[in-house]
Amino acid sequence: MKPTQSIMSRYKIAQSKNHYENFTVGSLVLGKDMREAIMTLYAFARLGDDIADEGNHSKKERTEQIQYLKNHLKKIEFNQKINDSYFKILQILYIKYKFRINNLYRFINAFNEDINHKQYAQFSDLIRYCDNAANPAGELILSLVKQDNKENVRQSNAICTALALINFAQGVVEDFEKGRIYIPKDEMKTFNLKVEDIQQRNFTKYWVKYKKYWVERNCQILGRGLGLGEKIKGRLGIEIQMVECAALLLLKRMKRNSCNLFVSPPKIKTLDWIFIFFKVALRSL
């Protein structure tokens, strides 16, 4: 069976899953063409994630499925005939927008890394992973509107890395159940953090201290990207500003002493998005 079979159905299912992604994809703020383009690219990322997370298949089987995706990217890149229905859509998108396809290859690297995941030794290793797993998303979106200059990409990468780190903090327990720990080994040792605490959902004083450290560092990373949305014209700029506001709100909630990441990690709810939309809209007047 092709790994892309019924991909749009899989994508719709993924949208309804109780996963830890807080940020809008293909928001109604965007125009129809841009929304469909972003959703098509997002479907690629979600499909790769789903393959990497599929515990019922062996590493070999999952690696072969990821290779299938990579082979079809090459067909798109070299304008070869494609029979796979999803990649036909992606090929049309590539011809229309001429987005930087190397960013999809970076996703491939991240998918393979997920399949063979080992806990990272240092924070710099985690940042390197984010550069493949998260940053290409922002760069792809900027390339759709030909706004992927060096400075915009720098800001976008800071935002996307911060979003990924927020998701890691929210999903410590969920990731652990998948056999993954995104907290670097050296920091677990420095802060006296125990793997058993994650398993038992025991948010000790050591985890509280580390959470504050994690949030402060993440605020600094996010700060390097703030303001990108105001620079991008039109609806996409509004969308980026909304994401920036959502990230700030989540970090603010994480910082609270009452926030237990193992039991009730903060999320962005519908009412929050409504408030954020009006906040950004008023700012844009």
Positions of predicted regions on the chain:
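Catalytic cores of Mg2+-dependent Asp-rich isoprenoid enzymes
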Residues: 1-164, 169-285
